[in-house]
């Protein structure tokens, strides 16, 4: 049985760790709130671009953009959004499992896959597959669109050149503090028109300069970039929520361990006192 001094040292060590996990929990909660605000702020922009794409496409039915063309799928591409740091529970692991399962389903149809990774965890994981075409990491707490456009462009070029026939973005969708869902969203090919709701929102009659085709090309590229960026912001909010929960669990577990160690310390102290009393009594009887 450990001595009282050793147990006291353990209690002190775990107490220090508990202070760290508690601080990390509070920091994650603060970052999550800010990430939610960025997430909500970016959505209207992407939604508006989607509606404009639908209207421009419907106004030029004779032109079909290559990014809207369905074709036989021989190879697929994934842009995988992950975290740069750990200590966020099974957030990355669950996402990677979903990607691997999805890619294996395509492989059963003789369709291979290429990957682009956003985040160091995704980079290190998918490097093992040997098909990592682009990667970016180290974006910090305020990811910006310009930091990910290079990796996105690599996959857009691959689609345009016919090297891949379908493109997905994968991220952890922030549902609420307790729930983050690994999500696979198809980026390309895009549907030609918007939703029925968009169709019924009124008639748009615009003149396009220089021409609808170049505007549509720019809009679609920007839309894809915004969809991926939305995934990055969603994933960051999910990361902070998962880390907050993980750190809270660690803090609670540390409290439980401290309670158990305190009980052991009290028992050890009681045993030592009893031993001392026994020795005093034995000594008195000997006299």
From Swiss-Prot:
It comes from the Bacteria. GO terms for molecular function: ATP binding; proton-transporting ATP synthase activity, rotational mechanism. It is found in: Cell inner membrane. It is a peripheral membrane protein. Signal peptide: none annotated. Produces ATP from ADP in the presence of a proton gradient across the membrane. The gamma chain is believed to be important in regulating ATPase activity and the flow of protons through the CF(0) complex. Belongs to the ATPase gamma chain family. This is ATP synthase gamma chain. The lineage of its organism: Bacteria, Pseudomonadati, Pseudomonadota, Gammaproteobacteria, Alteromonadales. The gene is atpG.
């Amino acid at each position: 049985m450990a001595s009282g001094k050793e147990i006291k040292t353990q209690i002190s060590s775990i107490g220090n760790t508990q202070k760290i996990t508690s601080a990390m929990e509070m920091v994650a909660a603060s970052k999550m709130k800010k990430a939610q605000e960025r997430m909500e702020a970016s959505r209207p922009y992407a939604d508006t671009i989607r509606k404009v794409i639908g209207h421009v496409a419907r106004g030029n039915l004779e032109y079909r953009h290559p990014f809207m063309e369905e074709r036989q799928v021989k190879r697929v591409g994934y842009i995988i959004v992950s975290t740069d740091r750990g200590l966020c529970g099974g957030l990355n692991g669950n996402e990677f499992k979903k990607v691997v399962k999805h890619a294996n389903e395509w492989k059963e149809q003789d369709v291979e896959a290429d990957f682009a990774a956003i985040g160091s965890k995704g980079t290190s994981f998918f490097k093992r597959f040997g098909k990592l075409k682009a990667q970016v990491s180290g974006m910090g707490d305020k990811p910006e669109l310009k930091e990910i456009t290079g990796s996105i462009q690599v996959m857009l070029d691959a689609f345009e050149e016919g090297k891949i026939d379908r493109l997905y973005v994968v991220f952890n969708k922030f549902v609420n503090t307790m729930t983050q869902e690994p999500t696979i969203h198809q980026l390309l090919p895009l549907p030609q028109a918007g939703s029925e709701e968009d169709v019924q929102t009124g008639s748009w009659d615009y003149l396009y300069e220089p021409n609808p085709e170049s505007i549509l090309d720019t809009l679609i590229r920007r839309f894809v970039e915004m969809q991926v960026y939305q995934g990055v912001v969603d994933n960051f909010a999910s990361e902070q929520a998962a880390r907050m929960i993980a750190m809270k669990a660690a803090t609670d577990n540390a409290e439980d361990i401290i309670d158990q160690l305190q009980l052991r310390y009290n028992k050890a102290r009681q045993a030592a006192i009893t031993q001392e009393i026994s020795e005093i009594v034995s000594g008195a009887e000997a006299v």
